[in-house]
Structures are given as C-alpha cells and as structure tokens.
Amino acid sequence: MELHRGRLIDHVHLRTRDLEAAKRFYRAALGVLDIPIEIADDHVWADELWIDAGEQGSHVHLAFQTGDRAMVDKAWRAGLAAGGKDNGAPGERKYHPGYYAGFLFDPDGNNIEVVHHGPAERSAASVKLTFG
C-alpha cells in the first residue's frame, strides 16, 4: 500500500468563532512543527491551511504530520498550553504499525491530530508550488 500526500487535498479552510484564540492555538502547535505561518488581522495561513472568522466554527478532523514522535509530543503539549483540549494523549494507535498520534480539540472544537507514521519511505518531503 502506498500513501500519497499533496495530490488529493489542495487546502483546508476552517472557520472560527474566536480568531484570536485560533491564532494563539495554531501559532503554538504549528510553530513546534517548524511550519511557516502567516498571522494577519483577518486570517491565519499555513501551507494548505486557511483560517478566518465566521459566526459558526467548523467541525472537522485535521491531521498534521511530523518528522518523529518527539515532535508529536511537543506539538500536543504546545496546543494544550495554548488553549486546546485533550482528545487523546500521544501514543501508538492501531491504524497501522508505527502510527503515533496525539489529538486535541482546538478552540472551535475541531479535532486536531498530530501524527508520525513511523518508518516510511518518502519520495519527497513535500511538493512545492511557486506563483508569479
């Protein structure tokens, strides 16, 4: 079985009822993963993730991949410290051998997963798109 990243999902758009709380949460959680994040007055943008304000928040499951188990632990703790709520401490899951993940609810109740897939062979770290 092969898993491919970067060919199915173009972007994820989350709506938040509290943009300032979302900014704190995602700045902390994604900062640990060394993902560049743009924090603007009216949005948060990090690679395929776009977050802006709305009257109703989104309710989705969103998983961020990491390079190792220590990053899962660190991102999970950072998310908790920034207002996330525990939805499953980091640990082995039964999804496939080596699947190590922690789960948090963000300030709007979205189920945020931080995952390391264990030993896996990658053809590339990511696909890079440039415009203009």
Give the positions of each predicted feature.
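N-terminal beta-strand motif that seeds the catalytic metal site of vicinal oxygen chelate
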Residues: M1-E20, L62, G118-G132
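Long, continuous compositionally biased terminal/linker segments
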Residues: E2, I39, V44-A82, G88
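Short glycine-enriched loop/turn motifs at secondary-structure junctions
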Residues: G6-L8, E55-S58, H96
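Core segments of cupin and vicinal oxygen chelate
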Residues: H13-W50
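Vicinal oxygen chelate
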Residues: R17-A21, F64-D108
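Short beta->alpha transition motifs characteristic of CBS
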Residues: P97, F103, V114-E121
